[in-house]
Amino acid sequence: MKTKKQQYVTIKGTKNGLTLHLDDACSFDELLDGLQNMLSIEQYTDGKGQKISVHVKLGNRFLYKEQEEQLTELIASKKDLFVHSIDSEVITKKEAQQIREEAEIISVSKIVRSGQVLQVKGDLLLIGDVNPGGTVRAGGNIFVLGSLKGIAHAGFNGNNQAVIAASEMLPTQLRINHVLNRSPDHIQKGNEMECAYLDTDGNMVIERLQHLAHLRPDLTRLEGGM
């Protein structure tokens, strides 16, 4: 009885080109052989003489740079195809470390004085003041348990969902991602903690901290970090 050969590659056509779903359990050599066989049998053309974009999905497989190059060269050997992207569900240790750092809440107890810059990759919890001329920067959110009278820049790595909160909100400048607000025309009422965030139109808004409960529900993770 003849054994049916295992299919290691599934090809699906989309409006953006072709998507190749590659088996993540077989060996890399078996994968290349399976892909070579499929590409030699099938003919792919858009009917207009233009190259077709190929999106490769690796699943739970990690490829070294040399292996990615082999895969890309094999697909590109078909004159009508070119590799647009290669996606894997597996991340490197460096990427995992970066994700961990960006999600980490860094707690610092100090006064940030004029000319000083305090920067963290994740969220910043500052127990102390930011004096005029002082700067705090975070890839995530900024929480100041004290007076914010200097500059605060949250979400500097492109995070529009970041917020800035302070016990006393009197900054010379607020910035979330690339949105800048110089010396906000705002007078804090009472002693309630306030926060700044970007609304759905990308405008900076300053509200009482309680408003964040429904605007940024994921911030409840701070309960475990404080």
UniProtKB/Swiss-Prot annotation:
Q: Which domain of life is it from?
A: Bacteria
User: What GO biological process terms does the UniProt entry carry, in alphabetical order?
Assistant: cell morphogenesis; division septum assembly; negative regulation of protein polymerization; regulation of cell septum assembly
Alphabetically ordered keywords of this record: Cell cycle, Cell division, Septation
* Coiled coil regions, renumbered to chain: none
Q: What does this protein do?
A: Cell division inhibitor that blocks the formation of polar Z ring septums. Rapidly oscillates between the poles of the cell to destabilize FtsZ filaments that have formed before they mature into polar Z rings. Prevents FtsZ polymerization. The MinCD complex plays an important role in asymmetric septum formation during sporulation of B.subtilis cells.
Q: Which NCBIfam families match?
A: minC
Q: Give the family, as the similarity comment puts it.
A: Belongs to the MinC family.
Q: How does it assemble?
A: Interacts with MinD and FtsZ.
What PANTHER family does UniProt report for this protein, alphabetically? SEPTUM SITE-DETERMINING PROTEIN MINC (PTHR34108:SF1)
Descriptive protein name:
Septum site-determining protein MinC
Record organism: Bacillus subtilis (strain 168)
